[in-house]
Curated annotation (Swiss-Prot):
Entry's family note: Belongs to the carbohydrate kinase PfkB family.
NCBIfam families given in the database record: PRK09434.1
SUPFAM superfamilies with a match to the protein in the record: Ribokinase-like
Listed GO MF terms: ATP binding; fructokinase activity
E.C. numbers: 2.7.1.4
Reaction equation(s) it catalyzes: D-fructose + ATP = D-fructose 6-phosphate + ADP + H(+)
EC primary class: transferase
InterPro entries: Carboh/pur_kinase_PfkB_CS, PfkB_Carbo_kinase, PfkB_dom, Ribo/fructo_kinase, Ribokinase-like
Organism: Escherichia coli
Taxonomic lineage of the native organism: Bacteria, Pseudomonadati, Pseudomonadota, Gammaproteobacteria, Enterobacterales
Keyword Zinc in record: no
Swiss-Prot/TrEMBL GO biological process terms: fructose metabolic process
Protein name, UniProt field: Fructokinase
Length: 307
């Protein structure tokens, strides 16, 4: 039986442009996407965060509940609005984001909103939760507490630089998060920002060793992913698909990764690690073939039919 994966952060309504100029509201937000992705793959997930006492907040609560995510620790905030993001897609399906609500309800997460952690559980989060107080303190408290309880931390920076007014603070928060994380997924851009170096096997291993990261992954889009695990670097080629919308690819990848790791733990051998990365890659590849982030997340049946 797989361990529970708690996901902390923002539950967002993405506004996607339609061909007729209208905006289509879609449930999203990287943490919420990961929680739903895990549930669709047959894992056990719970969401920790805040939404506004507004129609978009109600939409996110209904969506997560319908998808089988535990929302016991998703709180309604009557004073702040649900995070809302305008997503713009270019001709290649690549996206840019405009945050319409600042500060949004998710950034007011308190330490009293956190659950009691259990041995073997996982916590996953992104850097948006670190971008403002009191969410920053709550996120670091959660990371520290779950490790003390014998659990594991997964961190995907998913950096949105326009949410950070102070680059020095961003770097400090990233370093602290890396020190607390067991598993870290970086994009190529995030790798360059954090390491300041070109990407090669030696530098990837050095960063993993510096922060004592058990599994460090650098995703390269269509080119695949590089994984440093137990001091060894492994290269996985990308999967060829027709990209319609890349919005949820990274979140689908993480959902597949954590679904696998929550079943095996971090003591898995190389063969099992390769199986988990294959699952994560197939999830990411399927997610780009449909429009939307959460709507495109694959379920277990889709993956089985692709074999």
């Amino acid at each position: 039986m797989s361990a529970k994966v708690w996901v902390l952060g923002d539950a967002v309504v993405d506004l996607l442009p339609e061909s007729d100029g209208r905006l289509l509201p879609c449930p999203g937000g990287a943490p919420a996407n990961v929680a739903v992705g895990i549930a669709r793959l047959g894992g056990t997930s719970g969401f920790i965060g805040r939404v506004g006492d507004d129609p978009f907040g109600a939409l996110m609560q209904r969506t997560l509940l319908t998808e089988g995510v535990d929302i016991t620790y998703l709180k309604q905030d009557e004073w702040h609005r649900t995070s809302t993001v305008l997503v713009d897609l270019n001709d290649q399906g690549e996206r840019s984001f405009t945050f319409m609500v600042r500060p949004s309800a998710d950034l007011f997460l308190e330490t009293t909103d956190l659950p009691c952690w259990r041995h073997g559980e996982w916590l996953h989060l992104c850097s948006i939760a670190l971008s403002a107080e009191p969410s920053r303190t709550s996120a670091f408290t959660a990371m520290t507490a779950i490790r003390h309880a014998g659990g594991f931390v997964s961190f995907d920076p998913n950096i949105r630089e326009d949410l950070w007014q102070d680059e020095h603070l961003l770097r400090l928060c990233l370093r602290q998060a890396l020190q607390l994380a067991d598993v870290v997924k970086l994009s190529e851009e995030e790798w360059r920002l954090i390491s300041g170096k070109t990407q090669n096997d030696r530098d990837i291993c050095a960063l993993a060793k510096e922060y004592e990261i058990a599994m460090l992954l650098v995703t390269k889009g269509a080119e695949g992913v590089v994984v440093c695990y137990r001091g060894q670097v492994h290269h996985f080629a990308g999967m060829s698909v027709n990209c319609v919308d890349s919005t949820g690819a990274g979140d689908a990848f993480v959902a597949g990764l954590l679904t696998g790791l929550s079943s095996t733990g971090l003591s898995t051998d190389e063969r099992e690690m390769r199986r988990i990365i294959d699952l994560a890659q197939r999830c990411g590849a399927l997610a780009v073939t449909a429009k939307g982030a959460m709507t495109a997340l694959p379920c277990r049946q889709e993956l089985e039919s692709e074999k």
